[in-house]
Amino acid sequence: RDRLRSRGLGDVYKRQVMGKTSLAAFISVCPKIDTVKIKGRGQRSIDSFVEYVKKEFPQIKTITVCETMEEAIRDSDIISTTTCVGDKEILFPYIDEKWIKEGALVCMPSAARFDESFYLDKNTKLVVDNYKLYEAWAEEYPYPSYDPVQIVGCKFMDLLHDKKITRDEIIDVADVITGKLAGRENDKQRIIYSVGGMPVEDIAWGETVYKRALELGIGVKLHLWDEPELH
């Protein structure tokens, strides 16, 4: 369903660049967002983030710096986590499912710790950017893979390993985009979207930046070899 009416964003971040770019992405597709709630780590980075929002998105009417995760998450239509975490799930920032409103999108290019009941709830939809990416991670980092990889889609794979969910409960976003599978099915459904990152996106952006540099006549050409080692 169309969620362009989303108005509130709760941003829990420690990686500030990712927090900023995530916010820009959300606003590009949800232009009615007028409230941003922030939970950061240090005052300097929080101040920098607030200034960024004021400068880049003057349409944002309310910017709230939150003292707790709960304050940032409650009543938010979109929840974004860009956190740095420890090497065990028990050390990941905890998010109580009771804080997450019905119909919210939880967008995660990082890790957090949820109660298992949240993942298994019939009103929670598990979505990944590319299922085969997580399949490869699960092979490279054997169960439990969420600890070392620290992307929430790996938690989905751990639940699949434990037979607590089935393969068809992990939705590939490409299938939603192409209409093969449904996205949001009702206004109460909460979606947790795992963003692992895909090399094809890096290649596409790399080409865009390269062509732009050629147009502007900037950059430095590097001499990598006289002839390739393998030919």
Where are the regions a protein language model picked out?
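Adenosine-phosphate binding glycine-rich loop
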Residues: A112-E229
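Short, well-ordered coil/turn residues at beta-beta hairpins
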Residues: S80-T83, M108-P109, D129
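Hydrophobic/small residue at the entry helix of a nucleotide-binding pocket
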Residues: M18
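Single conserved hydrophobic/aromatic residue that forms the stacking wall/gate
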Residues: D2-L9, Y13
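Rossmann-fold NAD(P) dinucleotide-binding segment
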Residues: G86-A104
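Short acidic low-complexity segments
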Residues: K61-D75, P93-I95
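NAD(P)-binding Rossmann-fold cofactor-contacting core
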Residues: V29-E56
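A short, aliphatic-rich alpha-helical micro-motif
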Residues: A72-R74, W99-I100, L120
